[in-house]
Amino acid sequence: MHALQAKILDPRIGTEFPLPQYATPGSAGLDLRAMLQEDIVIKPGETVLIPTGLSVYIGDPNLAALILPRSGMGHKHGIVLGNLVGLIDSDYQGPLMVSCWNRGQTEFTMPVGERLAQLVLVPVVQAHFEMVEEFVETERGTGGFGHSGTK
């Protein structure tokens, strides 16, 4: 397990609400909560920025974190991430915020403390461009969207 430095920005974390944790031993993501002052209503088509009450510092340039949606929020309520995926670089130290977009047809009330997203650590490989005149030919070649078929 990798150590992740965190600062609690909202004093309710650790008292009223637990620190982010893995739901099961096999979980890939740490659940992040909506650390709001009061419940908010997100109207259809509306996007709001919600604080998690934490800041993190990964520190290791071989790692980054992704903020991903929780599947139940999108499937049951139409609440997805406004930017689809949040990328947290290893040298970022600011507050974690979650952009929530209501893509549904009805208003959604986001309760204080609701688990709204998950934080997943991922390996990072930085690359440099090697400029070439031609690529080595492959079976796929330049075939784009849908080129590999559906079956």
Curated annotation (Swiss-Prot):
The keyword Metal-binding applies. This is Deoxyuridine 5'-triphosphate nucleotidohydrolase. The lineage of its organism: Bacteria, Pseudomonadati, Pseudomonadota, Gammaproteobacteria, Pseudomonadales. One of its GO terms (molecular function) is dUTP diphosphatase activity. It catalyses: dUTP + H2O = dUMP + diphosphate + H(+). The keyword Protein biosynthesis does not apply. Its cofactor is Mg(2+). This enzyme is involved in nucleotide metabolism: it produces dUMP, the immediate precursor of thymidine nucleotides and it decreases the intracellular concentration of dUTP so that uracil cannot be incorporated into DNA. Gene3D superfamilies: 2.70.40.10. One of its GO terms (biological process) is dUMP biosynthetic process. It is an enzyme of class 3 (hydrolase). Substrate binds at R70, S71, G72, N83, L87, I88, D89, M97. Belongs to the dUTPase family. Its EC number is 3.6.1.23. It comes from the Bacteria. It comes from Pseudomonas fluorescens (strain Pf0-1). Keywords: Hydrolase, Magnesium, Metal-binding, Nucleotide metabolism. Pathway: Pyrimidine metabolism; dUMP biosynthesis; dUMP from dCTP (dUTP route): step 2/2.
